[in-house]
């Protein structure tokens, strides 16, 4: 799904005003659901969520938190509902056996770093995490899902976008009214720069919540300077990917933005290959897109690999250590 343009316009936009009554109902129901008590998991849960629909950087945040938890002596497993996959689970994701159409693209990436469980039913998934040897469960997304009690919830915000027009879906990108989501959050992860994100940071700090500023950095050793590329992506903000490539010196001769979580088909690959051949350029995409490509295409596409780097990692470590002390 591509976010409608009016989501980033003022809330007085005609379409936003037209859909606002529906948004009040949807947002209110979601907020009521968030307030319900959850089942007690076998081990503590760290939830990595966001206030809005769409991408904000949750997957790289979850991967960074796995690394930090291991540094603290914990054994994390990741729990995902497997958005975009047809298997309900609970199951342990195996990148060598599963495809994105079965378990979703994000779990395939997460499984490269730690045991990853896909489960529509989160309590069942949490039990499988424990059976896999975990002593802390990192839940990718799920801030609005009340089925499990969470020990700590961090909301990820894209600094360049913030909350858009600040209205609940479908009038805007919010999953529920912001005022009713704040009580469920213990900290903010602000990814990237921008005035929308700084406004969110100011509100979080006014509520006494820590703000962990971070940015996505390319993997060391990647050399994109002067490289002619056809860049394509089906993520929440493909333009952000294109801008990153340009900042690294790549010469983008063509851009192709697909909807978020787009399931690439042979026809897509044929069109992309023809475009690259015509332009005398290499194809490049994101890690999340790469796992959704047809098998025969993966070796022919360059991948921009990124990781999340925190401005003050010590502060985040302290929050994690307090929430998940070693026994």
UniProtKB/Swiss-Prot annotation:
Q: Which residues bind ATP?
A: 52-59
Give the record's GO biological process terms.
Answer: lipid A biosynthetic process; lipopolysaccharide core region biosynthetic process
The cross-references to InterPro entries, in alphabetical order and at most eight, read:
LpxK, P-loop_NTPase
Query: Which keywords annotate this record?
Result: ATP-binding, Kinase, Lipid A biosynthesis, Lipid biosynthesis, Lipid metabolism, Nucleotide-binding, Transferase
E.C. designation(s)? 2.7.1.130
Q: Does the keyword RNA-binding apply?
A: no
Q: Which reaction does it catalyse?
A: a lipid A disaccharide + ATP = a lipid IVA + ADP + H(+)
Pathway participation: Glycolipid biosynthesis; lipid IV(A) biosynthesis; lipid IV(A) from (3R)-3-hydroxytetradecanoyl-[acyl-carrier-protein] and UDP-N-acetyl-alpha-D-glucosamine: step 6/6
What Gene Ontology terms describe where this protein resides (cellular component)?
plasma membrane
Tell me one Pfam family matched here: LpxK
Q: Which domain of life is it from?
A: Bacteria
- Which GO-annotated molecular functions does the record name? ATP binding; tetraacyldisaccharide 4'-kinase activity
The record's comment on protein family reads: Belongs to the LpxK family.
The family database entries (NCBIfam families) matched by this protein are listed as:
lpxK
Summarize the protein's role: Transfers the gamma-phosphate of ATP to the 4'-position of a tetraacyldisaccharide 1-phosphate intermediate (termed DS-1-P) to form tetraacyldisaccharide 1,4'-bis-phosphate (lipid IVA).
Descriptive protein name: Tetraacyldisaccharide 4'-kinase
């Amino acid at each position: 799904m591509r976010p409608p343009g009016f989501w980033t316009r003022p809330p007085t936009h005609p379409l936003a005003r037209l859909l606002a009554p529906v948004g009040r109902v949807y947002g209110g129901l979601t907020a009521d659901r968030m307030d319900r008590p959850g089942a007690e998991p076998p081990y503590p849960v760290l939830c990595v969520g966001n206030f809005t629909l769409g991408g904000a950087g949750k997957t790289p945040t979850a991967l960074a938190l796995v690394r930090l938890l291991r540094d603290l002596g914990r054994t994390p497993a990741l729990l995902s509902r497997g958005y975009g996959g047809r298997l309900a689970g609970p199951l342990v994701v195996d990148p060598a056996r599963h495809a994105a159409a079965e378990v979703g693209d994000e779990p395939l990436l997460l499984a490269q770093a730690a045991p990853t469980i896909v489960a529509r039913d989160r309590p069942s998934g949490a039990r499988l995490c424990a059976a896999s040897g975990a002593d802390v469960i990192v839940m990718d997304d799920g801030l609005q899902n009340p089925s499990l009690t969470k020990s700590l919830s961090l909301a990820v915000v894209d600094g360049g976008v913030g909350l858009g027009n600040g209205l609940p879906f479908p009038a805007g990108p919010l999953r529920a009214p912001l005022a009713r989501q704040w009580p469920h959050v213990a900290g903010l992860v602000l990814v990237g720069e921008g005035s929308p994100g700084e406004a969110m940071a100011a509100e979080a700090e006014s509520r006494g919540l820590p703000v962990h500023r971070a940015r996505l950095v390319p993997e060391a050793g990647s050399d994109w300077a002067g490289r002619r590329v056809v860049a394509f992506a089906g993520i929440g903000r493909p333009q952000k990917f294109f801008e990153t490539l340009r900042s690294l010196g790549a010469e983008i001769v063509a851009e192709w933005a697909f909807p978020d979580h787009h399931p690439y088909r042979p026809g897509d690959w044929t069109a992309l290959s023809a475009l690259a051949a015509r332009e005398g350029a290499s194809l490049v995409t994101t890690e999340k897109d790469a796992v959704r490509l047809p098998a025969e295409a993966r070796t022919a596409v360059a991948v921009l690999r990124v990781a999340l780097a925190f401005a003050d990692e010590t502060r985040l470590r302290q929050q994690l250590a307090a929430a998940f002390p070693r026994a």
